[in-house]
Amino acid sequence: MTEQKRKLEKLTGVKGMNDILPQDAGLWEFFEATVKSLLRAYGYQNIRTPIVEHTQLFTRGIGEVTDIVEKEMYSFVDALNGENLTLRPENTAAVVRAAIEHNMLYDGPKRLWYLGPMFRHERPQRGRYRQFHQVGVEALGFAGPDADAEIIMMCQRLWDDLGLTGIKLEINSLGLAEERAAHRVELIKYLEQHVDKLDDDAQRRLYTNPLRVLDTKNPALQEIVRNAPQLIDFLGDVSRAHFDGLQRLLKANNLPFTINPRLVRGLDYYNLTVFEWVTDKLGAQGTVAAGGRYDPLIEQLGGKPTAACGWAMGVERILELLKEEHLVPEQEGVDVYVVHQGDAAREQAFIVAERLRDTGLDVILHCSADGAGASFKSQMKRADASGAAFAVIFGEDEVANGTVSVKPLRGTGAEGEKNVQQSVPVESLTEFLINAMVATAEDGDD
């Protein structure tokens, strides 16, 4: 292959890492604005951590025998200093690391939220990507079931704000460490009785992470799993009181839930409450949000013993649901598209476009694609395609007379007439456009 041909080859993105194109950006912005407004209403503060962390953060935090650490992390050795680094597969461990490093809990509990890309090396499919986005909350320093209930109810409010339906809540308790240890012994004994029927994945986990066997999706193992010892039967008084307290709060707020004794989550840092929000509208990838309590994690990562809970949700999956339920908002166009013909008109158009932006209007100023001036007809086609509400037109006559022509592209003009082009003095343009937009909005409300 020649060098010239190599240069002409079309490059594509990495499989499972998707571009967010302009036609989709409006949906992302709608979701982000909705979730940010919700999180502010609950008193949460934004935190932003690097996408690259020391690998040890995740092996210590998530657990060395979890699927994420064993098979799914993008890890590499920094050629400059030999450090083992990893693209973050999740963000709870990183937020906790930041809270410890910057002594954020010295003056009491913190409510934090994040939004950003995560990375996992797995087979791309619908709702599961190698680069994906999560929004999450971390309530650090809160020990009671009231914090668990609040973050769960926060999710329900988000579904309501987005207009989503059919997302169901499942909850469970993983108890405390000594209760999980007692259950682990009995679970291994039980699974050993069926070892010849376990698939390779279950056999691999039998002695390293047997709790995860309960989460298998293999149809052939469902009866074995259904009859396995349940962790909820091993809960002591403290764990049971915490779980009962959570249920009472959810019931008091009329939030329906199902207790799923097989719900265990795939990260080692969880204890007590775990929960998932699930839907049947996304095929196999039915979990749209998940979380729980992770009281041991802060101490495990070098901080003082501190209670904590949180959740994370997959943004792409929620956007899929919005599309499925036809809840995608219409893309808003700009307010004004400025059309001009001739050098003098172009100079005047630049000045006026900036003045309009100074007043808060969104303005596109026509710029030539090939360096030559486009015809009025061509520019007006672009103005209409842009979604702008009005075209502001500068020609030789307008420049000579100190006026502009304003043409409504959607709705009505200032005088209530549809698509009627009017001549307006330049000094009155801003007032005219604002009045025209008010008239258009009122026309749309009728």
From Swiss-Prot:
Pfam families: HGTP_anticodon, tRNA-synt_His. GO terms for biological process: histidyl-tRNA aminoacylation. It catalyses: tRNA(His) + L-histidine + ATP = L-histidyl-tRNA(His) + AMP + diphosphate + H(+). It comes from the Bacteria. InterPro entries: aa-tRNA-synth_II, aa-tRNA-synth_II/BPL/LPL, Anticodon-bd, Anticodon-bd_dom_sf, His-tRNA-ligase, HisRS-like_core, HisRS/HisZ, HisRS_anticodon. CDD domains: HisRS-like_core (cd00773), HisRS_anticodon (cd00859). Keywords: Aminoacyl-tRNA synthetase, ATP-binding, Cytoplasm, Ligase, Nucleotide-binding, Protein biosynthesis. Its EC number is 6.1.1.21. PROSITE patterns: AA_TRNA_LIGASE_II. The keyword Ligase applies. The keyword Aminoacyl-tRNA synthetase applies. Signal peptide: none annotated. SUPFAM superfamilies: Class II aaRS ABD-related, Class II aaRS and biotin synthetases. It is found in: Cytoplasm. PANTHER family: HISTIDINE--TRNA LIGASE, MITOCHONDRIAL-RELATED, HISTIDYL-TRNA SYNTHETASE. Belongs to the class-II aminoacyl-tRNA synthetase family. Homodimer. This is Histidine--tRNA ligase. It comes from Burkholderia pseudomallei (strain K96243).
